[in-house]
Amino acid sequence: MAARSELLRPAFGEASPSLGRFVINPHSCSYRWWHMFLIMLVLYSAWASPFELSMEKAASIALVVTDLVVDVFFAIDIALSFFVAYRDTSTGLLITDRRKITMRYLKRPCFALDVASTIPLQIIYQLVTGKRQGLWGLLNLLRLWRLRRVSKLFARVEKDIRFNYLWTRLIKLLCVTLFALHFAACIYLWMAFNYKIKELTWIGSQIHSFEDRSVWFCYTCAVYWSITTLATVGYGDLHATNIGEMLFSIAFMLFNMGLTSYIIGNITNLVVRETSNTFKMRDMVQRVSEFGRMNRLPEAMREQMLASVQLRFRTDEQLQQEMLSELPKAVRSGVMKHMFKSAIESCYLFQGVSDSLIVQLVAEMKAEFFPPKANVILENETSTDCYIIISGEVEALTTLADGTEKHVKRIGPRGMAGEIGVMFSIPQPFTIRSRRLTQVVRISHIHLLQAVRPNTADGYIVFSNFIQYLESLKVQTKDVAFVSDHLWNGNSMVLRRATEVAVDESKEAAHKMLPCKEPKRVVIHEQLPNATSTALHPSPGKLVLLPDSMQELMKLSEKKFGKAVRGILTVEGAEVEDIEVIRDGDHLLFS
């Protein structure tokens, strides 16, 4: 029953709290069952206390004996409260010291009210004076202090996901309404039975000698008037006839206004909360439809957009991403590893890699759903992501010279799509389209390279798997122009380097294993001292291949010119800080 936030938690650096002798854990099952038993007694007290007050003859021997038994149980609970550990709100620690527990309970106002609501003051007053009527009968209402336990119960149940929040709130509102009706009806009866002139009461003006009628007849009349007043219908058959009843009716109707507003506001909030996703989906579908009409999109494209939007809401894709993003990174990685590790390990590109690389890859993966006939990747678009098929099926298509699409192959679960463009750093060669409802996980180009670069051995395995896949793809699709062009022509050097590179632990070898474009060629010059104008017309330099890092470039310059190099400048005099900004054919000066 308890929410997770109520579990015991020690302070940072301290061991879990241990309970001392004769100290009760407030979150133990036995103590919670005791609380649930007391809740049943509280419900009885909430009904019996106003009912016994309303009419003297309502307090029968059976009710009096039951009240005494209930008071005994609450007296036992008061005694147990001196042994129940509590949580310090300032530190969040569970206090188990008996002396602190006792002093805290004695100093709190609830101790005095607990005792006052448990002592049978009305019975003692009746035994001493022999009277029950009068204002002393109101002491019986002190037992309503126990209702705070019900409020705490509802607050705890509302946070418990095992219970439906909607029904919990509705039951709470119903209980509040029923208690308000019952309490008002009992007060109306108490005022009528204690007024001197019975004919000048709300019930006496309509029913003569009502005090001789049965208890349940009078109670039914009182509940009837109470509920008509609460519902603001007011048939007029019953009405206030003296000043006291008028004043109480005014107070009761003011209370009814607030209670009605509270109930309407809560129910409205619950209904809106239950239907908010439907409203969002309808609004999004309407906006997508209007967007398609305004921009005169083809009908097939509009249907794809609508299907994607509807699928997104049906699968709660956005909710899943928001939920995962709020989790700590370690927890999120553990969840993603549990969900997608087997799929990645069985994917051809990552077969045989280490578990550490798998963990790095799943940490930033994102799950997505695609409806049937939806384009996952478009041909010739920028290669930013590759996809692993978790369920469903997609097909690879290529566009011929006449504009028609030609089927290349089908890709089922555990297959990959988009990896060719990512590995070669070229536009996507195929259009990838889903054949039915398909779930995929997306790996970004940047994250894939960041995960593979530091892992030299894993990088070798990845690119070896990729080469084998391209070989098999060429055999399967002999008539697809892309495969022959890129496998044997433009990237033949890349493939040879990937297969011939030895597994080296150095950082340079890890970079060489990655597919790269044709090396850049630059001209390096030795900057002449005290010659500002030479920067614009430098002396003839040396044509070299651009290395992979600034450190290698400076070492190469020192080797060529035979002197230490402190920095690298362009011919315009700008200092170069990143090797990536240097273009093919640039002239560089060294200082």
Curated annotation (Swiss-Prot):
It is found in: Membrane. It is a multi-pass membrane protein. GO terms for molecular function: voltage-gated potassium channel activity. Residues 54-63, 131-137, 194-220, 241-246 are extracellular. A nucleoside 3',5'-cyclic phosphate binds at residues 349-469. The chain crosses the membrane at residues 33-53, 64-84, 110-130, 138-158, 173-193, 247-267. It comes from the Eukaryota. Keywords: Ion channel, Ion transport, Membrane, Potassium, Potassium channel, Potassium transport, Transmembrane, Transmembrane helix, Transport, Voltage-gated channel. Residues 1-32, 85-109, 159-172, 268-591 are cytoplasmic. InterPro entries: cNMP-bd_dom, cNMP-bd_dom_sf, Ion_trans_dom, K_chnl_volt-dep_EAG/ELK/ERG, KAT/AKT, KHA_dom, RmlC-like_jellyroll. SMART domains: cNMP. The keyword Ion transport applies. Residues 521-591 form the KHA domain. Residues 221-240 dip into the membrane without crossing it. Pfam families: cNMP_binding, Ion_trans, KHA. GO terms for cellular component: monoatomic ion channel complex. The segment S4 is probably the voltage-sensor and is characterized by a series of positively charged amino acids. The pore-forming region H5 is enclosed by the transmembrane segments S5 and S6 in the Shaker-type (1P/6TM) and contains the GYGD signature motif which seems to be involved in potassium selectivity. The KHA domain (rich in hydrophobic and acidic residues) present in the C-terminal part is likely to be important for tetramerization. Probable inward-rectifying potassium channel. Assuming opened or closed conformations in response to the voltage difference across the membrane, the channel is activated by hyperpolarization. Belongs to the potassium channel family. Plant (TC 1.A.1.4) subfamily. This is Potassium channel KAT4. It comes from Oryza sativa subsp. japonica. The lineage of its organism: Eukaryota, Viridiplantae, Streptophyta, Embryophyta, Tracheophyta.
